[in-house]
Amino acid sequence: AFIWGGYSAFALTAVFSLILWWGLILSSLATPEGELFTEKMDRLHRSAYQLQVSEDGTRLKIQGEITFGFSNNFLQALKDHPGLKTIVLNSQGGHIYEARGAAKSIQDKGLNTHASRECSSACTLLFVAGRKRSLAPGAKIGFHQYALSFGNSLPNLDLQKEQEKDLAFFQSQGVKLPFLNRMFQHSSKTLWYPEYQELIDSGFLNSPN
């Protein structure tokens, strides 16, 4: 099982589980000739998001779900475009582990982050990893508790500890404690959208629009 940080995860994972189950039986019906099942699933995952580089090569736009394989493809995009300076985000979230991998790449390379419309749940890990963090007018940032993609519990996985791990990362990026204490108060079925001034005062945003 995997940890998801996107409020659309419940519906999406239900659909995904059906795709996976039927795909094992009927994959040949919708699979190009010669395509392996693993290749098909990678293609489906890639279709959930877009990575688009600006004409001048300085901005990489991420749009869609942060899903399986995302962090590797994101890192490859960074390698292919060494002139990138800013990551532009529009995502409702997705897979926490994939988001952590991408966030580390952003932090290591000292890239800036900018939310163009919405950056919620797992997407906020990418956002807070930025050196300079800004928000477009009307854009929003959303937070909620983590949830499992399948089932309600796993014996070796503590969601509270996973949240604490990411809270420590947020704090290391300059986000203040009162804000951190509110980040995971909402259930995984709802979202907390802080006001713009709250984001500024907390240190979550640190650059003008």
For every predicted segment, state its role.
Residues 107, 111-147:
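Glycine-rich beta-to-alpha active-site loop
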Residues 149-209:
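Charged, glycine-interspersed solvent-exposed loop segments at helix/strand-loop junctions
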Residues 62, 87, 127, 199:
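Terminal peptide-recognition signature
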Residues 53-62, 83-86, 145-151:
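Acidic/histidine-rich, surface-exposed loop or edge segments in extracytoplasmic proteins
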Residues 83-98, 112-118:
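Short, glycine-/small-residue-enriched flexible loop/hinge segments at domain edges that mediate gating
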Residues 41-73:
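STAS-typified acidic loop motif
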Residues 3-33:
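Transmembrane alpha-helices and immediately adjacent membrane-cytoplasm interface residues
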Residues 71-78, 99-103, 107, 124, ...:
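Extracytoplasmic/secreted envelope proteins and their assembly/folding machinery
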